Swiss-Prot record:
PTM comment text: Phosphorylated by phorbol 12-myristate 13-acetate (PMA)-activated PKC isoforms at Thr-352 and Thr-373. Methylated. Methylation is decreased by phorbol 12-myristate 13-acetate (PMA)-activated PKC, in vitro.
Domain of life: Eukaryota
Coiled-coil stretches: 42-62, 279-301
UniProt keywords, alphabetically: Coiled coil, Cytoplasm, Isopeptide bond, Methylation, mRNA processing, mRNA splicing, Nucleus, Phosphoprotein, RNA-binding, Transcription, Transcription regulation, Translation regulation, Ubl conjugation
Cross-linked residues, Glycyl lysine isopeptide (Lys-Gly) (interchain with G-Cter in SUMO2): K212, K274, K334
Family of this protein: Belongs to the SERBP1-HABP4 family.
UniProt organism field: Rattus norvegicus
Biased composition (Acidic residues): 402-411
Name of this protein: Intracellular hyaluronan-binding protein 4
Chief location bin: nucleus
Sequence position, cross-link Glycyl lysine isopeptide (Lys-Gly) (interchain with G-Cter in SUMO1): K212, K274, K334
Residues found modified as Phosphoserine: S7, S36, S74, S108
Tissue expression as described in the entry: Expressed in the heart. Expressed in cardiac myocytes (at protein level).
Length: 411
Protein backbone atom coordinates (compact mmCIF):
# COMPACT_ATOMS: atom_id res chain seq x y z
CA UNK A 1 0.00 0.00 0.00
CA UNK A 2 2.98 2.31 0.37
CA UNK A 3 3.62 2.15 -3.34
CA UNK A 4 -0.05 2.78 -3.97
CA UNK A 5 0.07 6.04 -2.07
CA UNK A 6 2.64 7.42 -4.46
CA UNK A 7 0.77 6.31 -7.58
CA UNK A 8 -0.57 8.87 -10.07
CA UNK A 9 -4.15 7.78 -9.30
CA UNK A 10 -3.68 8.65 -5.63
CA UNK A 11 -2.15 11.99 -6.56
CA UNK A 12 -5.06 12.76 -8.84
CA UNK A 13 -7.50 11.78 -6.08
CA UNK A 14 -5.77 14.04 -3.60
CA UNK A 15 -5.82 16.92 -6.09
CA UNK A 16 -9.51 16.31 -6.70
CA UNK A 17 -10.20 16.30 -2.99
CA UNK A 18 -8.40 19.59 -2.50
CA UNK A 19 -10.08 21.16 -5.51
CA UNK A 20 -13.69 20.05 -5.12
CA UNK A 21 -13.86 18.74 -1.58
CA UNK A 22 -15.75 15.57 -2.60
CA UNK A 23 -14.20 12.34 -3.88
CA UNK A 24 -16.33 9.44 -5.04
CA UNK A 25 -13.38 7.37 -6.32
CA UNK A 26 -11.38 4.83 -4.32
CA UNK A 27 -11.20 6.51 -0.94
CA UNK A 28 -8.81 4.15 0.83
CA UNK A 29 -6.71 3.32 -2.31
CA UNK A 30 -7.60 -0.36 -2.18
CA UNK A 31 -6.70 -2.82 -5.02
CA UNK A 32 -4.84 -0.17 -6.97
CA UNK A 33 -1.78 -2.46 -7.34
CA UNK A 34 -3.86 -5.54 -8.33
CA UNK A 35 -3.56 -6.07 -12.09
CA UNK A 36 -4.89 -9.66 -12.25
CA UNK A 37 -8.11 -10.51 -14.05
CA UNK A 38 -10.71 -12.44 -11.97
CA UNK A 39 -11.82 -14.33 -15.09
CA UNK A 40 -8.32 -15.76 -15.41
CA UNK A 41 -8.63 -17.23 -11.92
CA UNK A 42 -11.96 -18.80 -12.76
CA UNK A 43 -10.63 -20.27 -16.00
CA UNK A 44 -7.66 -21.76 -14.19
CA UNK A 45 -9.88 -23.42 -11.57
CA UNK A 46 -12.13 -24.84 -14.30
CA UNK A 47 -9.13 -26.19 -16.18
CA UNK A 48 -7.85 -27.86 -13.01
CA UNK A 49 -11.19 -29.52 -12.37
CA UNK A 50 -11.39 -30.89 -15.93
CA UNK A 51 -7.90 -32.35 -15.64
CA UNK A 52 -8.85 -34.15 -12.43
CA UNK A 53 -11.97 -35.62 -14.05
CA UNK A 54 -10.00 -36.85 -17.07
CA UNK A 55 -7.35 -38.43 -14.85
CA UNK A 56 -10.00 -40.20 -12.79
CA UNK A 57 -11.71 -41.61 -15.87
CA UNK A 58 -8.44 -42.89 -17.28
CA UNK A 59 -7.56 -44.61 -14.02
CA UNK A 60 -10.96 -46.33 -13.93
CA UNK A 61 -10.62 -47.48 -17.55
CA UNK A 62 -7.11 -48.86 -16.93
CA UNK A 63 -8.27 -50.73 -13.81
CA UNK A 64 -11.23 -52.27 -15.66
CA UNK A 65 -9.07 -53.37 -18.59
CA UNK A 66 -6.48 -54.92 -16.23
CA UNK A 67 -9.14 -56.87 -14.35
CA UNK A 68 -10.56 -58.28 -17.61
CA UNK A 69 -7.31 -60.00 -18.67
CA UNK A 70 -6.95 -63.69 -17.73
CA UNK A 71 -3.69 -64.23 -15.89
CA UNK A 72 -2.14 -61.18 -17.52
CA UNK A 73 -0.15 -58.48 -15.86
CA UNK A 74 0.81 -57.98 -12.30
CA UNK A 75 -1.34 -55.87 -10.00
CA UNK A 76 1.22 -53.07 -10.25
CA UNK A 77 0.73 -52.89 -14.01
CA UNK A 78 -3.05 -53.21 -13.61
CA UNK A 79 -3.12 -50.31 -11.19
CA UNK A 80 -1.45 -48.09 -13.80
CA UNK A 81 2.12 -47.96 -12.37
CA UNK A 82 5.27 -49.63 -13.54
CA UNK A 83 7.02 -51.92 -11.07
CA UNK A 84 10.19 -49.89 -11.10
CA UNK A 85 8.60 -46.51 -10.58
CA UNK A 86 6.57 -46.56 -7.41
CA UNK A 87 6.72 -42.89 -6.41
CA UNK A 88 6.57 -41.42 -9.94
CA UNK A 89 3.33 -40.63 -11.75
CA UNK A 90 2.39 -42.36 -14.93
CA UNK A 91 2.95 -40.34 -18.07
CA UNK A 92 0.34 -39.62 -20.73
CA UNK A 93 2.05 -41.83 -23.33
CA UNK A 94 2.01 -44.85 -21.01
CA UNK A 95 -1.70 -44.41 -20.39
CA UNK A 96 -2.42 -44.27 -24.12
CA UNK A 97 -0.36 -47.37 -24.79
CA UNK A 98 -2.18 -49.26 -22.03
CA UNK A 99 -5.56 -48.31 -23.49
CA UNK A 100 -4.57 -49.37 -27.03
CA UNK A 101 -3.16 -52.71 -25.87
CA UNK A 102 -6.28 -53.49 -23.87
CA UNK A 103 -8.45 -52.71 -26.89
CA UNK A 104 -6.38 -55.01 -29.16
CA UNK A 105 -6.66 -58.04 -26.84
CA UNK A 106 -8.65 -60.80 -28.69
CA UNK A 107 -9.52 -62.76 -25.55
CA UNK A 108 -11.81 -60.09 -24.06
CA UNK A 109 -14.87 -59.97 -26.32
CA UNK A 110 -17.29 -59.23 -23.50
CA UNK A 111 -15.32 -56.39 -21.94
CA UNK A 112 -16.73 -52.88 -21.96
CA UNK A 113 -15.44 -50.48 -24.56
CA UNK A 114 -13.48 -47.44 -23.42
CA UNK A 115 -15.40 -44.18 -23.22
CA UNK A 116 -15.59 -42.18 -26.41
CA UNK A 117 -15.37 -45.23 -28.70
CA UNK A 118 -18.94 -46.57 -28.60
CA UNK A 119 -20.67 -47.40 -31.84
CA UNK A 120 -23.90 -45.60 -32.64
CA UNK A 121 -26.86 -47.97 -33.18
CA UNK A 122 -27.79 -48.64 -36.77
CA UNK A 123 -31.13 -47.87 -38.34
CA UNK A 124 -33.77 -50.30 -37.15
CA UNK A 125 -31.87 -51.31 -34.02
CA UNK A 126 -32.66 -50.47 -30.43
CA UNK A 127 -30.35 -50.70 -27.48
CA UNK A 128 -31.58 -52.19 -24.25
CA UNK A 129 -29.87 -53.10 -20.98
CA UNK A 130 -29.79 -56.64 -19.69
CA UNK A 131 -29.42 -56.93 -15.95
CA UNK A 132 -28.00 -60.48 -16.06
CA UNK A 133 -24.94 -59.81 -18.25
CA UNK A 134 -24.51 -56.07 -18.17
CA UNK A 135 -24.10 -55.86 -21.94
CA UNK A 136 -26.02 -54.08 -24.69
CA UNK A 137 -28.82 -56.10 -26.27
CA UNK A 138 -29.67 -55.20 -29.85
CA UNK A 139 -33.30 -55.57 -30.90
CA UNK A 140 -34.08 -55.52 -34.59
CA UNK A 141 -37.36 -54.00 -35.64
CA UNK A 142 -39.01 -53.37 -38.94
CA UNK A 143 -37.62 -50.40 -40.74
CA UNK A 144 -39.96 -47.43 -40.57
CA UNK A 145 -40.45 -44.74 -43.15
CA UNK A 146 -38.98 -41.34 -42.44
CA UNK A 147 -40.98 -38.86 -40.36
CA UNK A 148 -41.18 -36.17 -43.03
CA UNK A 149 -41.70 -38.47 -45.99
CA UNK A 150 -44.59 -37.28 -48.14
CA UNK A 151 -47.32 -39.78 -48.89
CA UNK A 152 -50.72 -38.98 -50.41
CA UNK A 153 -53.46 -39.17 -47.81
CA UNK A 154 -56.07 -40.82 -50.01
CA UNK A 155 -53.79 -43.61 -51.21
CA UNK A 156 -52.65 -44.34 -47.67
CA UNK A 157 -56.20 -44.61 -46.33
CA UNK A 158 -57.34 -46.78 -49.23
CA UNK A 159 -54.45 -49.17 -48.68
CA UNK A 160 -55.26 -49.43 -44.97
CA UNK A 161 -58.95 -50.00 -45.65
CA UNK A 162 -58.27 -52.81 -48.16
CA UNK A 163 -55.81 -54.44 -45.79
CA UNK A 164 -58.24 -54.34 -42.88
CA UNK A 165 -61.18 -55.66 -44.90
CA UNK A 166 -59.55 -59.03 -45.56
CA UNK A 167 -58.05 -59.49 -42.10
CA UNK A 168 -60.00 -60.35 -38.96
CA UNK A 169 -57.36 -58.97 -36.64
CA UNK A 170 -57.98 -55.78 -34.71
CA UNK A 171 -56.00 -52.74 -35.84
CA UNK A 172 -53.56 -52.76 -32.93
CA UNK A 173 -50.71 -51.30 -35.02
CA UNK A 174 -52.52 -48.00 -35.50
CA UNK A 175 -50.85 -46.55 -32.41
CA UNK A 176 -47.53 -46.58 -34.26
CA UNK A 177 -48.84 -44.68 -37.26
CA UNK A 178 -49.94 -41.14 -37.88
CA UNK A 179 -53.58 -40.54 -37.05
CA UNK A 180 -54.81 -37.42 -38.80
CA UNK A 181 -58.49 -38.25 -38.17
CA UNK A 182 -58.12 -38.10 -34.38
CA UNK A 183 -58.73 -34.44 -33.68
CA UNK A 184 -61.30 -31.95 -34.85
CA UNK A 185 -59.26 -30.65 -37.78
CA UNK A 186 -57.69 -32.56 -40.63
CA UNK A 187 -54.03 -33.34 -41.19
CA UNK A 188 -51.50 -30.57 -40.91
CA UNK A 189 -51.24 -28.39 -43.97
CA UNK A 190 -54.30 -29.01 -46.14
CA UNK A 191 -56.99 -31.42 -47.33
CA UNK A 192 -60.13 -29.56 -46.28
CA UNK A 193 -63.24 -31.04 -44.72
CA UNK A 194 -61.37 -33.68 -42.71
CA UNK A 195 -62.70 -32.72 -39.30
CA UNK A 196 -65.52 -34.06 -37.20
CA UNK A 197 -68.56 -34.79 -39.35
CA UNK A 198 -66.94 -33.49 -42.53
CA UNK A 199 -67.51 -34.98 -45.98
CA UNK A 200 -63.96 -36.34 -45.98
CA UNK A 201 -64.96 -39.06 -43.52
CA UNK A 202 -67.95 -40.34 -45.47
CA UNK A 203 -65.85 -42.19 -48.03
CA UNK A 204 -64.24 -44.29 -45.29
CA UNK A 205 -67.29 -45.44 -43.34
CA UNK A 206 -66.55 -49.06 -44.31
CA UNK A 207 -63.43 -49.34 -42.19
CA UNK A 208 -62.85 -48.69 -38.51
CA UNK A 209 -61.18 -45.39 -37.71
CA UNK A 210 -60.55 -45.78 -33.98
CA UNK A 211 -60.83 -49.52 -33.50
CA UNK A 212 -64.49 -49.39 -32.38
CA UNK A 213 -67.71 -50.84 -33.74
CA UNK A 214 -69.95 -48.75 -35.96
CA UNK A 215 -73.63 -48.87 -35.05
CA UNK A 216 -76.32 -48.18 -37.60
CA UNK A 217 -78.68 -45.35 -36.76
CA UNK A 218 -82.35 -45.22 -37.64
CA UNK A 219 -84.68 -42.26 -37.82
CA UNK A 220 -87.28 -43.76 -35.46
CA UNK A 221 -87.08 -43.40 -31.69
CA UNK A 222 -86.99 -46.09 -29.01
CA UNK A 223 -90.58 -45.44 -27.99
CA UNK A 224 -91.92 -46.38 -31.42
CA UNK A 225 -89.99 -49.65 -31.39
CA UNK A 226 -91.27 -50.50 -27.93
CA UNK A 227 -94.84 -49.88 -29.01
CA UNK A 228 -94.46 -52.25 -31.92
CA UNK A 229 -93.00 -54.94 -29.67
CA UNK A 230 -95.86 -54.63 -27.18
CA UNK A 231 -98.38 -54.72 -30.01
CA UNK A 232 -96.98 -58.05 -31.17
CA UNK A 233 -97.40 -59.45 -27.65
CA UNK A 234 -100.41 -58.50 -25.60
CA UNK A 235 -101.48 -55.20 -27.11
CA UNK A 236 -101.19 -51.68 -25.80
CA UNK A 237 -100.45 -51.70 -22.06
CA UNK A 238 -101.06 -55.45 -22.00
CA UNK A 239 -104.83 -55.17 -22.71
CA UNK A 240 -106.17 -57.32 -25.48
CA UNK A 241 -104.29 -58.30 -28.57
CA UNK A 242 -102.82 -56.35 -31.46
CA UNK A 243 -105.84 -57.14 -33.67
CA UNK A 244 -108.28 -55.74 -31.14
CA UNK A 245 -106.44 -52.46 -30.89
CA UNK A 246 -106.17 -52.20 -34.66
CA UNK A 247 -109.94 -52.69 -34.99
CA UNK A 248 -110.89 -50.13 -32.34
CA UNK A 249 -108.43 -47.37 -33.21
CA UNK A 250 -109.61 -46.22 -36.75
CA UNK A 251 -112.91 -44.53 -35.63
CA UNK A 252 -110.95 -42.02 -33.53
CA UNK A 253 -109.56 -40.04 -36.51
CA UNK A 254 -113.04 -39.82 -38.08
CA UNK A 255 -114.49 -38.30 -34.91
CA UNK A 256 -111.62 -35.85 -34.69
CA UNK A 257 -112.13 -34.70 -38.30
CA UNK A 258 -115.86 -34.11 -37.71
CA UNK A 259 -115.11 -32.04 -34.60
CA UNK A 260 -112.55 -30.00 -36.51
CA UNK A 261 -115.05 -29.27 -39.29
CA UNK A 262 -117.66 -28.06 -36.80
CA UNK A 263 -115.15 -25.80 -35.06
CA UNK A 264 -114.05 -24.34 -38.39
CA UNK A 265 -117.68 -23.60 -39.37
CA UNK A 266 -118.30 -21.77 -36.07
CA UNK A 267 -115.12 -19.75 -36.45
CA UNK A 268 -116.05 -18.75 -40.02
CA UNK A 269 -119.45 -17.47 -38.86
CA UNK A 270 -117.93 -15.49 -36.00
CA UNK A 271 -115.29 -13.96 -38.27
CA UNK A 272 -117.94 -12.98 -40.88
CA UNK A 273 -120.01 -11.21 -38.20
CA UNK A 274 -117.00 -9.42 -36.72
CA UNK A 275 -115.63 -8.09 -40.02
CA UNK A 276 -118.37 -5.45 -40.72
CA UNK A 277 -118.33 -4.28 -37.10
CA UNK A 278 -114.59 -3.68 -37.26
CA UNK A 279 -114.94 -1.82 -40.56
CA UNK A 280 -117.62 0.49 -39.10
CA UNK A 281 -115.48 1.21 -36.05
CA UNK A 282 -112.46 2.04 -38.19
CA UNK A 283 -114.56 4.41 -40.33
CA UNK A 284 -115.80 6.17 -37.21
CA UNK A 285 -112.36 6.46 -35.72
CA UNK A 286 -110.57 7.77 -38.80
CA UNK A 287 -111.83 11.37 -38.88
CA UNK A 288 -109.50 14.23 -39.60
CA UNK A 289 -110.07 17.54 -37.79
CA UNK A 290 -108.12 20.67 -37.03
CA UNK A 291 -106.78 21.66 -33.65
CA UNK A 292 -109.50 24.26 -33.06
CA UNK A 293 -112.24 21.78 -33.87
CA UNK A 294 -110.73 19.27 -31.52
CA UNK A 295 -110.53 21.86 -28.72
CA UNK A 296 -114.17 22.84 -29.24
CA UNK A 297 -115.17 19.21 -29.13
CA UNK A 298 -113.28 18.75 -25.89
CA UNK A 299 -114.92 21.80 -24.33
CA UNK A 300 -118.36 20.55 -25.28
CA UNK A 301 -117.77 17.12 -23.85
CA UNK A 302 -116.10 18.47 -20.71
CA UNK A 303 -118.50 18.78 -17.72
CA UNK A 304 -119.03 22.39 -16.62
CA UNK A 305 -118.57 23.21 -12.92
CA UNK A 306 -121.68 24.43 -11.07
CA UNK A 307 -121.25 26.88 -8.19
CA UNK A 308 -123.94 27.80 -5.66
CA UNK A 309 -123.75 31.60 -5.98
CA UNK A 310 -126.15 33.71 -3.92
CA UNK A 311 -127.78 36.38 -6.01
CA UNK A 312 -128.84 39.79 -4.52
CA UNK A 313 -132.51 40.67 -4.36
CA UNK A 314 -133.51 43.33 -6.89
CA UNK A 315 -136.82 44.18 -5.26
CA UNK A 316 -136.90 46.96 -2.65
CA UNK A 317 -138.67 45.99 0.56
CA UNK A 318 -141.85 47.93 1.34
CA UNK A 319 -140.78 48.92 4.85
CA UNK A 320 -137.48 50.55 3.76
CA UNK A 321 -136.97 54.18 4.86
CA UNK A 322 -134.29 56.65 3.60
CA UNK A 323 -132.31 57.99 6.57
CA UNK A 324 -130.25 60.69 4.78
CA UNK A 325 -129.55 61.65 1.22
CA UNK A 326 -126.18 61.34 -0.40
CA UNK A 327 -124.04 64.48 -0.71
CA UNK A 328 -123.05 63.68 -4.27
CA UNK A 329 -125.16 62.85 -7.18
CA UNK A 330 -125.00 59.35 -8.39
CA UNK A 331 -124.29 60.24 -12.00
CA UNK A 332 -121.34 62.49 -11.10
CA UNK A 333 -119.87 59.89 -8.81
CA UNK A 334 -120.16 57.24 -11.49
CA UNK A 335 -118.49 59.41 -14.12
CA UNK A 336 -115.64 60.37 -11.83
CA UNK A 337 -115.16 56.77 -10.84
CA UNK A 338 -115.04 55.63 -14.44
CA UNK A 339 -112.57 58.37 -15.47
CA UNK A 340 -110.31 58.17 -12.43
CA UNK A 341 -110.49 54.53 -11.70
CA UNK A 342 -106.73 54.27 -11.51
CA UNK A 343 -106.43 56.86 -8.68
CA UNK A 344 -106.18 55.44 -5.15
CA UNK A 345 -108.20 56.81 -2.28
CA UNK A 346 -106.54 59.08 0.26
CA UNK A 347 -107.00 58.92 3.98
CA UNK A 348 -108.75 61.66 5.91
CA UNK A 349 -105.63 62.63 7.91
CA UNK A 350 -103.35 62.78 4.86
CA UNK A 351 -101.29 66.03 5.01
CA UNK A 352 -98.77 65.28 2.30
CA UNK A 353 -100.38 67.83 -0.01
CA UNK A 354 -99.80 70.58 2.59
CA UNK A 355 -96.06 70.00 2.91
CA UNK A 356 -93.44 71.82 0.85
CA UNK A 357 -90.75 69.46 -0.28
CA UNK A 358 -87.55 71.05 -1.66
CA UNK A 359 -84.77 69.00 -3.22
CA UNK A 360 -81.88 71.39 -2.55
CA UNK A 361 -78.17 70.45 -2.60
CA UNK A 362 -76.26 70.99 0.61
CA UNK A 363 -72.85 72.74 0.25
CA UNK A 364 -70.06 70.21 -0.29
CA UNK A 365 -67.17 70.46 2.17
CA UNK A 366 -64.28 71.87 0.17
CA UNK A 367 -60.75 70.58 -0.10
CA UNK A 368 -59.01 73.93 0.20
CA UNK A 369 -56.48 75.50 -2.12
CA UNK A 370 -53.27 73.74 -2.98
CA UNK A 371 -51.23 76.74 -2.02
CA UNK A 372 -52.49 76.90 1.53
CA UNK A 373 -50.33 78.20 4.32
CA UNK A 374 -49.93 74.80 5.93
CA UNK A 375 -49.11 73.03 2.72
CA UNK A 376 -51.82 70.50 2.27
CA UNK A 377 -55.32 69.90 1.18
CA UNK A 378 -57.79 71.25 3.64
CA UNK A 379 -60.95 69.43 4.52
CA UNK A 380 -62.87 72.49 5.78
CA UNK A 381 -63.74 75.35 3.49
CA UNK A 382 -62.94 78.63 5.16
CA UNK A 383 -64.95 81.81 4.69
CA UNK A 384 -61.94 84.09 4.39
CA UNK A 385 -60.98 82.41 1.15
CA UNK A 386 -64.37 83.37 -0.31
CA UNK A 387 -64.57 87.04 0.67
CA UNK A 388 -67.14 88.39 -1.75
CA UNK A 389 -69.14 85.10 -1.76
CA UNK A 390 -69.81 84.94 1.97
CA UNK A 391 -73.45 85.85 1.54
CA UNK A 392 -74.01 83.11 -1.06
CA UNK A 393 -72.74 80.28 1.13
CA UNK A 394 -75.64 79.28 3.34
CA UNK A 395 -75.92 76.04 5.26
CA UNK A 396 -79.34 74.62 6.05
CA UNK A 397 -80.05 73.26 9.46
CA UNK A 398 -80.25 69.49 9.67
CA UNK A 399 -83.77 68.16 10.30
CA UNK A 400 -84.66 67.19 13.82
CA UNK A 401 -86.11 63.67 14.05
CA UNK A 402 -88.14 64.58 17.14
CA UNK A 403 -89.90 67.44 15.42
CA UNK A 404 -93.22 66.35 13.80
CA UNK A 405 -93.00 69.15 11.26
CA UNK A 406 -89.71 67.85 9.87
CA UNK A 407 -90.88 64.23 10.03
CA UNK A 408 -94.62 64.13 9.39
CA UNK A 409 -96.59 61.03 10.17
CA UNK A 410 -97.20 58.86 7.18
CA UNK A 411 -100.61 57.30 6.92
Amino acid sequence: MKGALGSPVAAAGAAMQETFGCVVANRFHQLLDDESDPFDILREAEHRRQQQLQRKRRDEAAAASGAGHRGGRSPAVASGHRPGAAGRRESQKERKSLAVSSAQQPDSPGGPQPPGQKRTPRRGEQQGWNDNRGTDVVLDRAERRSYREYRPYDTERQAESTAEKFTDEKPVDRFDRDRPLRGRGGPRGGLRNRGRGGPGNRAFDSFDQRGKRDFERYGSSDKANRMEDSMGGCGVRTWGSGKDTSDTEPPAPMEETSMMEECQGVLDEESASKVPELEVEEENQVQEMTLDEWKNLQEQTRPKPEFNIRKPESTVPSKAVVIHKSRYRDDIVKDDYEDESHVFRKAANDITSQLEINFGNLPRPGRGARGSTRGGRGRIRRTENYGPRAEVVTQDVAPNPDDPEDFPALA
